[in-house]
């Protein structure tokens, strides 16, 4: 490993496994990030955009009805209320300010559910940067409202037809573009994964989620929660929630992976629970892979969790036992999606529904246990209504 300013590893996970040509680019990004973090003018501009453009701080909402019949108090951290509809907007604003600071004139990004693409498109529109969004052709189909939003805001959406036509293929295509155009282009990675320094940058630009949550829950309840719960694909919303609680050892950190059609079917996206460490997307982290090391197709009903690997800090937190990573199936997530809508009047993203489903399981398995839980409601479900409507109609669920 060449010298870096910040530690590129979390235990054994992380690193900079990229073509030689990109090492200086990553180091330039790291240097710009470290300098920006110490520059009051950068911080002021970032915080101003978060407050007056994105709408921070987001609310902490108590569920009045969902946990009736149990002694659990369940709060939702409302990242779904952020401009753009998900937590993605937080770190996108930070990274675009960084790109401008480095003199880059073009932004590229990958997206699965389309939420990161939308966040990138809206920030590029506002800050006057052209952008190209790489998206698996399959995801372009299942997330059509977000594709229209991106195009409406001036982004070029590039459907990727290679491989499984999903997020992992979009990531590879974006990385190729970056290697060819790094002099004028910033690759705005959408999650806390990829080569160093991306996992650290994304965490630092998302950690206000947990900071706000801690202050809000102490004000409302006078104590810390027993657990904070977030869904995990690449892991940015979860690391944003976890970071301020890592040293609070009384608080369980629960990251929920997608079990898809059931772990036993092989159709899932749970590399922490069922993968093996390997090199992928510029980092060392658990990956879903075959016996001979080929990357397996991940699967989840939610495009944003349909990823065969995970951010290296989550791999580290899992390896030291500080965080736990259970999984939730498509069907459990769909049920939670429906329950939150029907009992609280909030339509969650299918991604966030995985975290909600696990919280409801915790409440209902121990109805007499007094628990204070916080779920990071990482995004809203507008993008998923057509997918869910089709399934509910077929199954007679509504």
Curated annotation (Swiss-Prot):
Modified residues annotated as N6-(pyridoxal phosphate)lysine in this record: 88
Enzyme class: lyase
Protein's pathway: Amino-acid biosynthesis; L-tryptophan biosynthesis; L-tryptophan from chorismate: step 5/5
Species in which this protein is naturally found: Mannheimia succiniciproducens (strain KCTC 0769BP / MBEL55E)
Enzyme Commission number(s) from the entry: 4.2.1.20
Function: The beta subunit is responsible for the synthesis of L-tryptophan from indole and L-serine.
InterPro entries: Trp_synth_b_CS, Trp_synth_beta, Trp_synth_beta/beta-like, TrpB-like_PALP, TrpB-like_PALP_sf
Swiss-Prot/TrEMBL cofactor(s): pyridoxal 5'-phosphate
Assembly: Tetramer of two alpha and two beta chains.
Higher taxonomy: Bacteria, Pseudomonadati, Pseudomonadota, Gammaproteobacteria, Pasteurellales
Keywords from the UniProt entry: Amino-acid biosynthesis, Aromatic amino acid biosynthesis, Lyase, Pyridoxal phosphate, Tryptophan biosynthesis
GO MF annotation terms: tryptophan synthase activity
Protein name per UniProt: Tryptophan synthase beta chain
Protein family per UniProt: Belongs to the TrpB family.
CC terms in the record's Gene Ontology section: cytoplasm
PANTHER family to which the protein is assigned, alphabetical: TRYPTOPHAN SYNTHASE, TRYPTOPHAN SYNTHASE-RELATED
Catalytic activity: (1S,2R)-1-C-(indol-3-yl)glycerol 3-phosphate + L-serine = D-glyceraldehyde 3-phosphate + L-tryptophan + H2O
């Amino acid at each position: 490993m060449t010298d870096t300013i910040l530690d590129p590893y979390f235990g054994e996970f992380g690193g900079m496994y990229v073509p030689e040509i990109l090492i200086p680019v990553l180091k330039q990004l790291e240097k710009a990030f470290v300098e920006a973090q110490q520059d009051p003018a950068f911080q002021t501009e970032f915080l101003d955009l978060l407050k007056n453009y994105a709408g921070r701080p987001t609310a902490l909402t108590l569920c009045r009805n969902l946990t009736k019949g149990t002694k659990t108090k369940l709060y939702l951290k409302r990242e779904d209320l952020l401009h753009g509809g998900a937590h993605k907007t937080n770190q996108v604003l930070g990274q675009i300010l960084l790109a401008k600071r480095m003199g880059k004139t073009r932004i590229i990004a990958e997206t699965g559910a389309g939420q990161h693409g939308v966040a990138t498109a809206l920030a590029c529109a506002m800050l006057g940067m052209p952008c190209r969004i790489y998206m698996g052709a399959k995801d372009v189909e299942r997330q059509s409202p977000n594709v229209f939003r991106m195009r409406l805001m001036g982004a070029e959406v590039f459907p990727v037809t290679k491989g499984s036509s999903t997020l992992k293929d979009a990531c590879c295509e974006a990385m190729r573009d970056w290697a060819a155009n790094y002099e004028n282009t910033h690759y705005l990675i959408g999650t806390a994964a990829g080569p160093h320094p991306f996992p650290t940058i994304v965490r630092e630009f998302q950690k206000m989620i947990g900071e706000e949550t801690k202050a809000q829950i102490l004000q409302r309840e006078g104590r810390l929660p027993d657990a904070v719960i977030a869904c995990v694909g690449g892991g940015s919303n979860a690391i944003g929630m976890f970071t301020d609680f890592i040293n609070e050892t009384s608080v369980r950190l629960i990251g929920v992976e997608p079990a898809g059609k059931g772990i036993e079917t092989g159709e899932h996206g749970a590399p922490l629970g069922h993968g093996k460490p390997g090199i992928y997307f510029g980092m060392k982290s658990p990956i879903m892979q075959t016996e001979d090391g080929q990357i397996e197709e991940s699967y989840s009903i939610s495009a944003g969790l349909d990823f065969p690997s995970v951010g290296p800090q989550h791999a580290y937190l899992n390896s030291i036992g500080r965080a736990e990573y259970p999984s939730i199936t498509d069907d459990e997530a769909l049920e939670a999606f429906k329950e939150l809508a029907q009992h609280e009047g909030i339509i969650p993203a299918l991604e966030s529904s995985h975290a909600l489903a696990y919280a409801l399981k915790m409440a209902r398995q121990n109805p007499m246990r007094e628990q204070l839980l916080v779920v990071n409601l990482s995004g809203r479900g507008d993008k998923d209504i057509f997918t869910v409507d089709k399934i509910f109609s077929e199954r007679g669920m509504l």
